[in-house]
Amino acid sequence: MKGKIKSVVFKDAKRWRRWLRVNHRRKTEIWLVLPKKSAGGDSYRVYYNQALEEALCFGWIDSRIKPLDETRSLVRFTPRKSKNWSRYNIERALELMRKRKMTEAGRKVLPPDLISRLEKLGKTGDHAE
């Protein structure tokens, strides 16, 4: 990667979700500043798991992590494709659907075989946008 990375810090997960709601179709990437697991304190209130869950809701995924300093990392999020879903992220997506947090944009990139199974079970109804 050449040049300086433009990064963003969100005060909380609600603000990250708001950014995704507005930008998930317009932007091609964002680099979030997130605390490392070993970092103490609460100066950064969006943590990796929260950031990933909100991203999945809008059809985005994390792709690269770069150290920023001793306590923070840069994490790149981009729109995701339908293939190459890990079992962990499929389970996470199902849980987000149960919680009614998954948006139409998030459902559109679910693996086709998973969508077929969910339709048979009647579990792909409209959820929060």
Question: Which residue ranges define each predicted feature?
Answer:
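Charge-dense, helix-prone N-terminal extensions
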Residues: M1-E129
